[in-house]
């Protein structure tokens, strides 16, 4: 079934699958129904992977949702549903997310509103890097995400400060490698893919994330 994937992607996906298969098994028992029949969304959906407090789970590469902008969360759920995100065979965490995002518009609206009610606290710092070097590299990022990394809705750029740093490292690495942002319908992802050219290696990625960590989260 996974023979279309490169060997290293298959290995990574299987490792990830052993952690999330129990979650997927539970979710198979929970139908996504129409608006008249839906039940309130609770830990059966998002919190099983993203945490009961919405702060994320590094072990299964599930980022924090608490504090995420409603418009950005909506866009990502819609992208997963449309196959715009999580389509690349090397984006193993994205592939794992796609079955979880087969939602109606009303379901997405419910989830976005529910997540928006969670308390927000900045994520713990787990990534080390050269903050001074990262500050220089972040100049390109600031064009869209702002000098304070608090995001810019008009640019479609989410806040970076306060997000799980391991998640930022993973996603920047995916953009650099071409695993994310290459779908022809991913307008904002394509913009990101074009902007990460200055991040030439893992050290540069960690440096810029270390600088983001040094900024005050909202």
Give names to the regions the model predicted.
Residues 96-143, 147:
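Surface-exposed, polar helix/loop patches in the mature regions of secreted/periplasmic/lumenal proteins
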Residues 17-28:
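Bacterial N-terminal signal peptides
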Residues 33-55, 126-150:
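Sequence/structural segment immediately N-terminal to covalent heme-attachment motifs in c-type
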Residues 58-64, 80-108, 124-129, 153-159, ...:
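Axial heme c-ligation environment in periplasmic c-type cytochrome domains
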Residues 43-46, 62, 70, 94, ...:
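Disulfide-stabilized extracellular ectodomain repeats and their linkers
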Residues 70, 74-82, 105-112, 116, ...:
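An amphipathic alpha-helix signature
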Residues 1-15:
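N-terminal secretory signal peptides that target proteins for export/translocation
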Residues 44-82:
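The feature marks the first
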């Amino acid at each position: 079934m996974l023979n279309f994937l490169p060997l290293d992607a298959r290995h990574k996906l299987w490792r990830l699958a052993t952690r999330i298969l129990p979650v997927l098994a539970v979710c198979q028992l929970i139908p996504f129904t129409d608006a008249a029949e839906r039940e309130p969304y609770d830990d059966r959906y998002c919190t099983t992977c993203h945490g009961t407090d919405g702060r994320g789970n590094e072990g299964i590469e599930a980022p924090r949702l608490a504090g995420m902008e409603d418009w950005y969360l909506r866009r990502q759920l819609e992208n997963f549903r449309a196959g715009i995100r999580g389509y690349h065979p090397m984006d193993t965490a994205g592939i794992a997310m796609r079955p979880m995002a087969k939602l109606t518009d009303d379901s997405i609206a419910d989830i976005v509103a529910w997540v928006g009610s969670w308390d927000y606290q900045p994520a713990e710092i787990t990534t080390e890097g050269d903050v001074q070097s990262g500050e220089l590299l972040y100049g390109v990022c600031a064009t869209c995400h702002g000098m304070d990394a608090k995001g810019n809705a008009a640019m479609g750029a989410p806040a970076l400060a306060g997000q799980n740093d391991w998640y930022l490292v993973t996603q920047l690495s995916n953009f650099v490698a071409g695993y994310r942002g290459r779908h022809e319908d991913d307008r904002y992802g394509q913009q990101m893919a074009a902007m990460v050219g200055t991040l030439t290696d893992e050290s540069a990625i960690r440096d810029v994330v270390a600088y983001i960590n040094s900024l005050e989260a909202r």
